[in-house]
Amino acid sequence: MQTGNFKTRRSGLVLSSVEGFRNVKGSFRDGCKEVQFLRIVGMDGTALMETAAMDRSLTEQMGRGQGFYNRKNSLPKLAALEDVEFYSGAYRNWADSGKHSVSLKTPVQNQQLPHVISGACAEILGLLGQGKQGMNQSIEKNFIAKVLFWLDEIFSPALQAWKPDYVMKAVFANISKPQEYLFCYLLTLLGADVLLLQAKQDIPAELEGL
């Protein structure tokens, strides 16, 4: 994806372990951020130990101001009425802007980021609609509202500190729903490295090409 002078590309480096994901740092040159989108199916004892070590190491680095890290076992539910109203309004504002800029609860310092997020939302919305029967504005609104909510809930510190070469890593467990998987993909479009630990569930085959 490319938005303005910021773009991302999938790293050609092949990783197969949690430790490899922890240690990798993609390059940034000529406005292009190299990112990882890694999926590990099954968790053995080694992977569990490497995950614990990753939590310690990357949390310590974040505490020293060296990038952002977050690991989640599940994505939060958009349920509170005030949140539903806010993010439904954020979707309408995004649509009214021609899908060029997006607003969140998180105060964003970098003026480029709302446009980067907007472009990423448009891309994953297009992917959601591929081959989907009955795609309509209501489905579109509910999806984008959830995505913006998840960004605020999970990624707020990273959004506040964001710059094109900022180091961000996010880890999620047992992602199997298309909308959740597309959110994880969106994070890579913002420049984050993303790891999916699929111990119990995995994505459907049609999503593997992303």
Positions of predicted regions on the chain:
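Active-site and donor-binding regions of nucleotide-sugar-utilizing enzymes
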Residues: 123, 128-209
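Conserved N-terminal ligand/cofactor-binding loop architecture of enzyme catalytic domains
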Residues: 1-20, 28-147, 207-210
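Short alpha-helical segments and helix-capping/turn motifs at coil-helix boundaries
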Residues: 21-23, 52-54, 178-184
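Short boundary motifs at domain starts and secondary-structure transition points
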Residues: 20-31, 154-164
